[in-house]
Amino acid sequence: MSNSMLDKNKAILTGGGALLLGLIVLFYLAYRPKAEVLQGFLEAREYSVSSKVPGRIEKVFVKKGDRIKKGDLVFSISSPELEAKLAQAEAGHKAAKAVSDEVKRGSRDETINSARDVWQAAKSQANLAKETYKRVQDLYDNGVASLQKRDEAYAAYESTKYNESAAYQKYKMALGGASSESKIAAKAKESAALGQVNEVESYLKDVKALAPIDGEVSNVLLSGGELSPKGFPVVLMIDLKDSWLKISVPEKYLNEFKVGKEFEGYIPALKRSAKFRVKYLSVMGDFATWKATNNSNTYDMKSYEVEAIPLEELENFRVGMSVLVTIKP
């Protein structure tokens, strides 16, 4: 065999070997296990700033993006109806207190003196009737007065005696004042009226809505001059210090996201990675179930909602930023 033929065969073998090696490499690259990338989103605690008082918005003191402190004035409400109710409640309380004070103080001196005079007059009438009856009785015993006259004198004596007793009881009532039950009832009415005043005043305090936390204004839903229903969230705030990552994890990767386990995620918007710790997981609804297409080799996989807190401060992060978590094969 000539040298040219040997060189030609050698070239064919070399080319075939290179082609085979290339096919092996391509096959490996095509079918090797690949890393799975899960995408989640950053969230933060949201608070609604609302008022217990329905009314017209007087003024909103903040706008979207403002950083405010706990206790800062957020908005105020004008409510003339509530101020009118306060005036009514205060008037009712004054009236109830006056009645309670009168009952507690007892009868006036004039009432007591009048009752005493009536009793003394009835007492004098009773004494006179008693003496008259004694005289008539003596005359009857001596045969001078008739039985009819004696009975009339006795009836007059009995009547004046009962009148004296009734007048004396009224005098005692005037001295003692109202009964304990009347005093308790009057005091209870005063307390109820005071409670109405306190209730209206507590509502009036809520016409000025204050920030419940240190945070950022995420949205303003009503402006000055608009009507606000009771409890309507006029302003929304977010607490950037209370943030977490929410991510949907297929069941087959759940072992990587046990509660308390730490993992790393990449935040494209911040061009940095951050560590997170799983604090909560829960199965998602059937809409998130991955249905198997081949019952012999695969199975339906549930998806789980995982919440994880960042282990470091995420400076300049915003709600809704994506976080990419790589699951190594």
UniProtKB/Swiss-Prot annotation:
GO CC annotation, single: membrane
Bilayer-crossing regions: 11-31
Source organism superkingdom: Bacteria
Membrane-related topology note: Single-pass membrane protein
A Pfam family it matches: HlyD_D23
Entries under PANTHER family matching the protein: 36 KDA ANTIGEN (PTHR30438:SF1), 36 KDA ANTIGEN-RELATED (PTHR30438)
The name this protein goes by in its record: 36 kDa antigen
Organism: Helicobacter pylori (strain J99 / ATCC 700824)
